[in-house]
Each structure stands twice: as structure tokens, then as C-alpha cells.
């Protein structure tokens, strides 16, 4: 996009959600500008697992093949006791013919792929070092006030989208710094990226360990032996105390009870976890998507998959408006339905995912936990297993049905009733993407 062309949409946040939305819009020929306060792409791996609804959107953007070249297909998921005893699992190989099969790739690598693609789009501009400090709108336009290396600027567009993460300045400016309804969990979580040899133990690529104190997740996130090991800790500890306790924790719960000489930690990130939803995902010409709009605990990767599905739905709405196929009121549908998906699917199921690990007796888990019993059934009933895994599509929604003319049916709720009926965790969640 030339320096004199006014963008039709401005996207705040050049992380993966903002880059994906920008790429989808730019591929339609829509002039867009991304602004980000950073001066480069985020280099942290963060989340890693993309469920089928997310891969559908990434395939629409034309990046799925490159993701799979650089990443891999996880082979399955298990729930275990702390001694490694297998309780139940999900065989994702049953859906190996799905064009949107779950894929694992660190988020920073996806960001690089998306940035390379959007850089080739003539209607897209990415402006680094642009910090949003204020915003406004009237009947004709919306704007953001930004601090830039060249001084303060006022940037205008028809629509402005906040894809600027959990600490979203767009959301804060719309609703106030502390207006993000929901809760913060008492649990202290520590996410690590660790090289450790799990091969002697014949575990799946993603594993959840049920224990009241030493619950954790171990998920393969690379083809070079790198695992995301994320575990629960005592609340109230300092960073130094958490680091001091880490060798004890690993020796206590990892298979083989290793000493520090037997593994290599390359990233150590303690954080608190939240369940929160913005008061609205639309205010006039402003919209929110992904972490800027809602948060959930990371056990299950539902924040990543759900956020990408937000972006795909918002793209269909904005593209419909731009092409004259939809009225601006379609954005009210976006805000309503994406909030509904959070409240009915993402929030309760992601909450169940962590309570399943630390809120029950592992010796009675198969007896008391309906989901684990269903996983056991699915081990021998493959048709039932496919229905379970297909339930993930309940996250999707076809916003083109609200076009004035018949849309392209970009979205599906296939098997969604099954998911709601059985209150199932998404298989994307089961793979254990973690935002560290």
C-alpha cells in the first residue's frame, strides 16, 4: 500500500492473530495497515498446537502447507497418573485424512510465515514502533492516536481491530484499564521449554498428568526433542523460589526422575492464568479478536484455536462489508456469536481441562470423570472417536449466511451438537497448546 493510500482497516497488533487477519483482508485487495509498538516479530515460541478449526482458517490464508513443512502432526494424547500409568487417550491418527488436521508449530514460526506472506501483498503495510495511546470514532471513520519514531500521529480508517493481546490498549481505551470481566485462577503455572528424552517411556506426543500437587502437561513441540513441560506450583512464590524448586519438581514428576544434568531448559516462564471476556467484541467501528477479547487457561490450547477462529469470522464480516455483501450490523452478529462461543465452549471446557488435572483423585478418575470414560470407549469404538474429534467444529460459525446475497459457507458447526451434548474438551485442547 502506498504511503498516500488511506487504509480501509487498521489492525493493532502484529502478532499472529493480527497478521492473519491482515493477510486475509489484503488477499482480498482490501487496503490495511498493521501497527505494533514493538520493532520486530515476537521471538518467543509461546503456543504451539492448532486444532482443525484453526487450520481451516490458516489454510484459507494460504500458509497451512508451510506450517506443516516446518512443524509436525502430533500422534495422540494421553491422561496418566504421576507414575506414568495410562488412564485414557485420544488417537488423532483416526483423522489423518482431514485436510485441516491438527498441526504443531511454535507460534513465533507461524508469525514469521505470516509476515513473509503479508509483506508480498501490495495493499498491506506493517508499521513497527507504533504505540497506540488513544482512539476515537464518529459517523464516518475511526482513528487511533499513536506514538511513532517520527512523533505523534493520528491514523484513520473505516474500521479498527484490536488484535493486541491480553493487555490490549484498544480494549483498555474502549472500556477502561480494569474492565475485563472474569476471574484469575489461584493456581501458579510454570511453562518451560525443555529438552528431555521421553522415548524410553513410550508416551504420546501430548500427555496430561493428573495429581493434586504435581499436575503437569508434557507436549512435544519440535522434531528435535523439545518439549513444553508446564506444571502447577504453590501460589505466592517469587521467581527465585520457583527456579529453586524446579529441579525438585522435575525429579518428583517426570518419568525417570531425572537430575538437572539429564535435561536442558531453554525457557522458564511463570505466569498466572485467567478466564476473562471483554464487555463486548464490538464498539461501533472498533472490534476485538483473540486474546484482546478473551482469555482462558492454557491447558488445552483453546485460547489459540479459538482466537484464530475469531479472526476467520471477523474476516468474513469485514470482507462482506467492504464488498457490499453485508451491512455493518453483521459485526453485531460477530460480537454476539463469538462471545457465545467463548461462554458456551471455550470457558467451561478450558476450565474443565485444568480441574481434570488437579481437582480429582487420580485413582478414581476413570470412575468419576465422564470425559475420560468416553475416551476409553473411543479407544475401541472408532466411529464414536471420530464424532468426538469432529465436535471441535462447534467453535466455527458461518458468518457469510448473514450476507445480503448467499455467501460461501466459510464455517461449519458439523458435530457441534455432539460436543455440546457431551461437554467434550476439544481435541485441539487435548494436544496441549500452552501460551508461555
Model-based region annotation:
Residues 14-23, 27-31, 58, 114, ...:
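Conserved mid-domain beta->alpha element of the FAD-binding
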Residues 2-17:
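Beta1/beta-strand and adjacent pyrophosphate-binding region of the FAD-binding site
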Residues 26-47:
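Glycine-rich FAD pyrophosphate-binding loop
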Residues 5, 317-436:
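C-terminal helical "tail/cap" subdomain of flavin- and related membrane-associated enzymes
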Residues 116, 134, 139-143, 147-153, ...:
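Conserved FAD-binding catalytic core of PHBH/FMO-like flavoproteins
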Residues 43-46, 50-119, 136, 220, ...:
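Active-site-adjacent segment of FAD-dependent monooxygenases/related oxidoreductases
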Residues 68, 125-127, 181, 266:
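General small-molecule cofactor/ligand-binding pocket signal
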Residues 119-133:
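A conserved beta-strand/loop element that lines the FAD pocket in flavoprotein oxidoreductases
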Amino acid at each position: 500500500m502506498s504511503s498516500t493510500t488511506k487504509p480501509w482497516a487498521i489492525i493493532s497488533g502484529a502478532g499472529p492473530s493480527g497478521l492473519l487477519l491482515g493477510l486475509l483482508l489484503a488477499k482480498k485487495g482490501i487496503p490495511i495497515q498493521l501497527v505494533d509498538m514493538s520493532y520486530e516479530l515476537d521471538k518467543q515460541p509461546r503456543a504451539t498446537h492448532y486444532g482443525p478449526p484453526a487450520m481451516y482458517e490458516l489454510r484459507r490464508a494460504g500458509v497451512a502447507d508451510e506450517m506443516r513443512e516446518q512443524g509436525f502432526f502430533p500422534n495422540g494424547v494421553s491422561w496418566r497418573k504421576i507414575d506414568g500409568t495410562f488412564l485414557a487417550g485420544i488417537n488423532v491418527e483416526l483423522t489423518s485424512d482431514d485436510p485441516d488436521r491438527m498441526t504443531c508449530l511454535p507460534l513465533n514460526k507461524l508469525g514469521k510465515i505470516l509476515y513473509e506472506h503479508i509483506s508480498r501483498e501490495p495493499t498491506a503495510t506493517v508499521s513497527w514502533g507504533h504505540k497506540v495511546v488513544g482512539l476515537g470514532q464518529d459517523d464516518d471513520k475511526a482513528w487511533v492516536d499513536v506514538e511513532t519514531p517520527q512523533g505523534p500521529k493520528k491514523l484513520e480508517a473505516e474500521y479498527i481491530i484490536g488484535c493486541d493481546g491480553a493487555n490490549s490498549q484498544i480494549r483498555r481505551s474502549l472500556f477502561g484499564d480494569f474492565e475485563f470481566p472474569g476471574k484469575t485462577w489461584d493456581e501458579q503455572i510454570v511453562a518451560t521449554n525443555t529438552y528431555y528424552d521421553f522415548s524410553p517411556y513410550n508416551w504420546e506426543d501430548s500427555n496430561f498428568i493428573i495429581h493434586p500437587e504435581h499436575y503437569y502437561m508434557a507436549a512435544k513441540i519440535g522434531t528435535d526433542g523439545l518439549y513444553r513441560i508446564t506444571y502447577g506450583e504453590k501460589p505466592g512464590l517469587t521467581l527465585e523460589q520457583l527456579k529453586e524448586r524446579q529441579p525438585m519438581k522435575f525429579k518428583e514428576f517426570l518419568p525417570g526422575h531425572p537430575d538437572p544434568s539429564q535435561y536442558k531448559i531453554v525457557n522458564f516462564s511463570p505466569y498466572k492464568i485467567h478466564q476473562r471476556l471483554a464487555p463486548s467484541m464490538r464498539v461501533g467501528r472498533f472490534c476485538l479478536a483473540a486474546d484482546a477479547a478473551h482469555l482462558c487457561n492454557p491447558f488445552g490450547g483453546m485460547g489459540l484455536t479459538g482466537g484464530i477462529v475469531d479472526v476467520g469470522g471477523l474476516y468474513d464480516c469485514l470482507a462482506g462489508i467492504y464488498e457490499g455483501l453485508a451491512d455493518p450490523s453483521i459485526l453485531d452478529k460477530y460480537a454476539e456469536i463469538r462471545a457465545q462461543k467463548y461462554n458456551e465452549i471455550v470457558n467451561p471446557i478450558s476450565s474443565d481441562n485444568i480441574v481434570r488435572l488437579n481437582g480429582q483423585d487420580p485413582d478414581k478418575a476413570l470412575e468419576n470423570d465422564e470425559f475420560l470414560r468416553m475416551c476409553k470407549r473411543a479407544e475401541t469404538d472408532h466411529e464414536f472417536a471420530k464424532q468426538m474429534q469432529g465436535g471441535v467444529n462447534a467453535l466455527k460459525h458461518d458468518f457469510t449466511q448473514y450476507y445480503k446475497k448467499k455467501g460461501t459457507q466459510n464455517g461449519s458447526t458439523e458435530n457441534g451438537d455432539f460436543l455440546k451434548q457431551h461437554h467434550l474438551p476439544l481435541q485441539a485442547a487435548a494436544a496441549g497448546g500452552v501460551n508461555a
